[in-house]
Amino acid sequence: MNKKIEKNNNVINKPNKYESNTTDNQLIMKKNANSGSKKSRSTKVEVETNLPKRRGRRPKKILDSFESTTNVLNTSTEQNNSAVILRLPKIDPSKLSGLKNKQGRKVFEVPETTEPGDNYSDNELSEGMFRNDIPKDDVCHKCIKYEKEITHLKNEVMKLKNCDKTDKTSKIHNTSVTFISLGSGKKMSLKKTNLRCLWDCHKFDNIPCYLPELYNNGKYYVIASVFCSFNCALAHNLYYIKDSKIDIRKSLVFRLYRELYGLTPDEPIELKEAPPKELLEDFGGKVNIIDYRRSFIKLNKEFIVYMPPLKPIGVQIVEHDTDTDGNDTDRDYVLKRNKPLMKGRGIVSMMGFNK
């Protein structure tokens, strides 16, 4: 009997396979539940982080997880953005294309990026090979363009200098200066003359100068007398005439000088009155005429007037019939009497003059 009781106890104490399987399944389900709870928590954290900000202080766990994710993202972006800068020296592509190694093969071949039919301007062309840092030539296109402009400007400056040198001997002015005599009203021309200077009373070889009295409609009304220089004309105005129009005549002399020499109003002019003629030897002084005129400004140039050719603008022909005895049938009258005049009711008969 005792043996049977022990056996029954052993049977009771031994776990059944079904019960053990159920317990194991329960444990696995708990573990999965626990593990699933962590995943759900992490997803909840991510959802909460994506939600808009709320008032109050965040839990510490959420802050720690957010900082860790941002640090990971920053490190990944820094690793991706890291770049290597390579600076190549300036090398002529033509030299590189000619290089060969020991086996006779070309070390470097420049690919043709453009077709032979393409035409590009200087601005569109790149300054370097492959349109990068390596230039096609040692000198860039802009430098060549600027050098051409500099040489062109230098040539223009040299031409202007040469023109200035030649203009000292001969110059053409597009001017229409006309001189009219105050006494006779006739037109006077700038030509050499055998007359003596009115101020120093000596002959001269240059073109005569005049003292303008009035300027009107582009014409200078001058005194008929001639002067060897503008200095003598100003001296005659200051020392001999001595009237209220001294400044007017002087300003007209300056204006005439600028117009004859093609000067602008801003350019300075050094025109002074000639010294008194009593300094000359002929007037009892000690100075000869050469020293007296040494500092004068003379018109040592000959002015030739070139008249442009005259072209007819247009010719109009007017036809007029001079034959008045012909028929007047072709004429159209503006006023025409439709009714004939009454013979018995004229003005004379009505007034009674016929009686």
Swiss-Prot record:
Organism phylogeny: Viruses, Varidnaviria, Bamfordvirae, Nucleocytoviricota, Megaviricetes
Protein name: Uncharacterized protein R450
Annotated segments matching region Disordered: 1-61
Biased composition (Polar residues): 18-37
